[in-house]
């Protein structure tokens, strides 16, 4: 069940307007960051703020439409977007799910981070101000075909993406925290290719 939540969260698993400084940070990040790599933690909280799930891993993306998220603890899961298809590999189950990339992502955080820089096309943008010395931004997806109601993003003084929060219609909140962010690293094209392991069950297209 938790793994299902994890994959749904990702698909829901990467906007927005604040005061002038935050607008500049967001647009600068989207326009100038063609690729990135970071460690992350992902915490899922229920409507009462109780932790349901906590996982850690490494993410990479390269525009347009390529990304790789490796969930490492407490279990392994790999999510890859190769520009055309979305691959989800559950290591424990040796099971692969594959979908068309556009159908899998839509107006999602992953689409935002690894897609084009036309932010306003998929999101309604509003100001949420400054908290804990971070500029917070809110994005509400224009499409109704998403499993979340809004995304919050926070940038530090260096215009680095530090936190993302996803809120869904059940009151759940998923908090992604990024560390050791590297902007525009040279990433191997092999990172964004996926071949199902021998013997794996493949579901989908």
Positions of the model-derived regions?
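Positively charged n-region of N-terminal signal peptides that target proteins for export
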Residues: 1-4
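Bacterial N-terminal signal peptides
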Residues: 7-16
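Flexible, processing/modification-adjacent segments and terminal tails
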Residues: 21-46, 50-52, 80, 89-149, ...
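Beta-strand elements of well-folded, non-transmembrane domains
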Residues: 44, 61-63, 159
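Amphipathic hydrophobic-ligand
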Residues: 52-58
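An acidic-aromatic
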Residues: 58-107, 174
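Gly/Pro-enriched, hydrophobic low-complexity segments
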Residues: 121-126, 130-205
């Amino acid at each position: 069940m938790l793994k299902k939540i994890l994959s749904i969260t990702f698909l829901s698993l990467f906007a927005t307007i604040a005061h002038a400084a935050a607008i500049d940070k967001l647009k600068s990040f989207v326009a100038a960051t063609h690729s990135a790599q970071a460690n992350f933690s992902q915490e899922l909280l229920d409507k009462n703020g109780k932790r349901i799930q906590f996982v850690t891993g490494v993410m990479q993306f390269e525009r347009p439409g390529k990304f790789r998220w490796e969930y490492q603890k407490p279990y392994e899961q790999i999510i890859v977007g190769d520009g055309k298809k979305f691959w989800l590999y559950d290591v424990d189950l040796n099971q692969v799910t594959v979908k068309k990339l556009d159908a899998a992502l839509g107006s999602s955080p992953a689409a935002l981070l690894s897609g084009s820089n036309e932010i306003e096309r998929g999101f309604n943008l509003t100001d949420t101000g400054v908290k804990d010395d971070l500029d917070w931004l809110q994005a509400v997806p224009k499409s109704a075909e998403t499993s979340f109601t809004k995304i919050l993003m926070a940038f530090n003084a260096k215009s680095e993406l530090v936190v993302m929060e996803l809120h869904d219609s059940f009151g759940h909140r998923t908090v992604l925290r990024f560390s050791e962010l590297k902007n525009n690293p040279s990433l191997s094209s092999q990172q964004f290719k996926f071949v199902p392991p021998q013997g794996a069950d493949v579901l989908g297209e």
